[in-house]
Regions:
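Loop-rich non-cytosolic ectodomains and luminal regions
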Residues: 2-767
Length: 767
């Protein structure tokens, strides 16, 4: 009897566990008009989402199979329309029967795209965009990230006026975070973790806070980059000493914690954007993302479209998967996609070999130089093939102790390599670049004397180690902080275009400082993020498109202060058409991701490097309505159901207004031709709005891409007043050659009038 009972219990447990395992979190998109009409006809007292969940529960429970009731995680009603829930396969089938159902997207985890820059960008205290009159305006920047360290000096509210009455946000209490943590600077803090915990399990509170408090540093860093207070005498152990400041340093900040140790759940990101728009943010900053997807299947694209409809400017990082082509994420045309580049500040080191050769490197190590020490590589192994990468447990202390170890990049993080060398008794580390990794130098907060080197120096060092007649030696010296390097230079890691889902729009849009950025950091989080690192800092130096994105978010807030009636598209246009393609020496911007650091192109930096002061007075703007964006989706041959996911309901693609994909009123031109196209042509129309001098005349200047003729009609446009809109057409003709598939050529189209030069890049690609 007991045996039968055990068998019964075991069978029940197995059946129940299978039912649980069958569950998955889905983001459900609904047609707002249809679903409300459908459920209200049944019970007008019940919320629409409750009616949907009840229908699924009742239908599934009436079947012969055991089903656990669906679990509702979020309801989305502002930036998109739908909900997130845990459903079984059967329940998903029942949901598909409901009139108004559009799509179900499985939830997934996305990743983070992991001072002096205001000066480098030309912002000056008391002048221009940083004038008292401009900074007096209230702008609220919402930051979706790993949370925030509210007590940091960068987020104190001294001198700020009371919180705007329009603000509807909240300060949610949680672990080590009370509602009193917010103030007139940090006006809101919310947590979104339901999707993450369904995917990765309950948050480990020994490693993270189950609240808006930041345990990783990333969110604190990005928030202060966008809008942190101006803090004098900030530095990283004396490096980069100066005033640390956000781009719009007296903006309010609202922190939305959506990212945890293992990533950021799409369902949580959607909920945060939905809530942020309802709360009343003016700008959204997202330094996170995944691979590019069709817009109807991209949660950030969908929610950002809804935010744009409400007048919210959305800035996103392009990603850190460069320099390979078509790696950029967050590429929807209504999103400002930001690449990363260097400023002219560096943290140089000097590596001297035993043969007298000297190489320049980079590091944030703040200690004494090493003496000339034995240099080892590969032969430091315990028999493990990964010893050249200095992975955990791969180094033999007997072979490493007291020596400098050369380590290849890859497999583990750069600071983890240094930690492994130190734990094995090594006295220093030289981080080697492969040929593919180029001349990119990383300044990292190493726990021992260490430096990174470019590929050419790395190649020489490998040869020296293998072929030196004497035992190889090296020393590392640390030279502090220097200024005046050629800049900007595109970072090799910055993700590139062309867009894999919308090649008719150039992506990324612009580049901004994203390498070696000094910004706020939680004092309980080590600068290297290593457990063995017991150092505490208030400011850390970090690199990534995660760092460039909040620069643009803060600059957009500055522009919004000057032009309160401008749409997100107009602000975006101003930032793009005034961006610079030249460095501080007057030469074209170079690219660390290309062979021999050749000149960067629009697939690396979009329209160029942001220029805040010029963007505040662009002369002309290319404006785009949400209807224009929807017609653009029509031109991509999206179905009505796919478009409805973004429009939140029925939208009919009218033939007469349907755009050619490249005909969106975008501030750049992406042109596609077949490889064997000869004399093939395409004509795009653009409309520009005068926001400069009331009475003004512009003449066009064209730099033609190789292999293409460009004709503009008319070649002169004349405005009578501010707000006037005039159109022009551009015809591109591919002539007389058979191109290689995937090859591109570049040019530009600029409208010139006095001090104004409204520039649009041209990218022609042969498919």
């Amino acid at each position: 009897m007991i045996f039968r009972t055990l068998l019964f219990l075991l069978a029940y447990m197995v059946t129940n566990s299978v039912a649980v395992m069958d569950k998955q979190t889905y983001i459900i998109h609904m047609d707002k008009t249809k679903i409300k009409a459908s459920v209200h006809s049944q019970d007008k007292t019940k919320p629409w989402f409750k009616s949907v969940i009840d229908f699924i529960s009742e239908t599934s429970s009436s079947s012969s199979e055991e089903e656990i009731a669906p679990q509702l995680l979020y309801v989305y009603e502002t930036s998109m329309f739908g909900f997130a829930a845990q459903l079984s396969n059967k329940q998903l089938e029942y949901l598909n029967q409901i009139d108004g159902f559009l799509s179900a997207i499985p939830d997934e985890l996305l990743t983070l795209h992991t001072t002096y820059s205001p000066h480098f960008l030309g912002l000056q205290n008391g002048k221009g965009l940083w004038s008292a009159s401009n900074l007096a305006s209230d702008v609220i920047i919402g930051v979706l990230d790993t949370g925030i360290w509210p007590e940091h000096i960068s987020f104190q509210d001294t001198g700020l006026s009371k919180v705007p009455s329009r603000w509807k946000g909240a300060c949610e209490a949680g672990t080590n975070f009370s509602s009193s943590c917010c103030n007139k600077k940090l006006v809101g803090a919310r947590v979104f973790l339901r999707g993450y915990e369904k995917s990765a399990g309950r948050i480990n509170e020994t490693m993270d806070y189950r609240s808006a408090r930041d345990a990783q540093g990333h969110g604190t860093h990005t928030a202060s980059t966008a809008a942190g207070n101006m803090v004098s005498n900030a530095s990283f152990f004396g490096l980069a000493r100066g005033s640390a400041s956000g781009m719009r340093y007296n903006s309010r900040i609202a922190a939305y914690k959506v990212c945890w140790r293992l990533g950021c759940a799409n369902s949580d990101i959607l909920a945060a954007i939905d809530q942020a728009v309802a709360d009343g943010v003016d700008v959204l900053s997202l330094s996170l993302g995944g691979i590019a997807k069709p817009y109807y299947n991209d949660s950030i694209a969908i929610a950002s479209f809804g935010a744009t409809q409400k007048g919210v400017f959305v800035s996103c990082s392009a990603g850190n998967s460069g320099p390979s082509s078509s790696t950029a994420g967050n590429v929807a045309p209504w999103i400002m996609t930001v690449a990363a580049s260097y400023t002219d500040r560096s943290f140089p080191t000097q590596v001297k070999l035993g043969n007298g050769k000297v190489f320049k490197g980079s590091s944030l190590y703040k200690g004494k130089k090493t003496s000339q020490l034995p240099l080892v590589y590969r032969n430091s192994s315990r028999g493990q093939r990964t010893a050249q990468y200095c992975t955990k447990g791969s180094l033999d202390p007997k072979l490493v102790k007291g020596k400098i170890v050369a380590c290849e990049r890859g497999i583990n993080s750069r600071t983890e390599k240094g930690e492994e060398v130190k734990m094995a008794g090594g006295a220093g580390m030289i981080l080697l670049n492969s040929e593919n990794q180029g001349e990119e130098l990383f300044a990292d907060p190493h726990v021992l004397p260490a430096t990174s080197l470019g590929s050419s120096a790395s190649k020489t060092i490998r040869s020296y180690i293998f072929h030196s007649a004497k035992a190889p030696t090296a020393s590392i010296s640390f030279l502090g902080t220097t200024y005046g390097d050629t800049a900007p230079v595109m970072a090799a890691f910055s993700s590139r275009g062309p867009s894999s889902v919308g090649p008719d729009v150039i992506k990324p849009d612009v580049t901004a400082p994203g390498v070696n950025i000094l910004a706020a950091w939680p004092p309980t989080t080590s600068p290297s993020m290593l457990k063995s690192d017991k150092r505490s800092v208030l400011f850390n130096i970090v690199s990534g498109t995660s760092m460039s994105c909040p620069h643009v978010s803060g600059i957009a807030a500055l522009i919004k202060s000057v032009h309160k009636d401008w749409s997100p598209a107009a602000i975006k246009s101003a930032l793009m058409t005034t961006a610079s393609t030249s460095n501080n020496k007057g030469a074209p911007i170079s690219d660390n991701g290309s062979i021999n650091s050749a000149f960067a192109d629009p697939f690396a930096f979009g329209s160029g490097h942001v220029n805040p002061e010029r963007a505040s007075d662009p002369g002309l703007v290319y404006d785009i309505t949400t209807k224009d964006y929807l017609n653009y989706l029509c031109s991509l041959k999206y179905t009505s159901s796919q478009i409805a996911i973004l429009s939140k309901g029925n939208f009919k693609c009218a033939k007469k207004s349907a755009l050619h994909a490249g005909g969106l009123n975008y501030p750049s031109f992406a042109v596609l031709f077949g490889t064997s196209a000869r004399n093939a042509s395409v004509t795009y129309k653009r409309v520009v709005t005068n926001v400069g001098n009331p009475s003004s005349s512009y003449a066009v200047k064209v730099e033609k891409p190789k292999g293409v003729s460009v004709t503009v009609e008319p070649r002169n446009i004349n405005f009578r007043k501010i707000g006037d809109k005039l159109s022009y057409k551009v015809t591109f003709v591919s002539y007389g050659r058979t191109a290689v598939a995937g090859s591109s050529s570049f040019g530009s189209l600029t409208w010139v009038s006095g001090k104004y030069a409204v520039r649009s890049p041209i990218a022609v690609t042969w498919q």
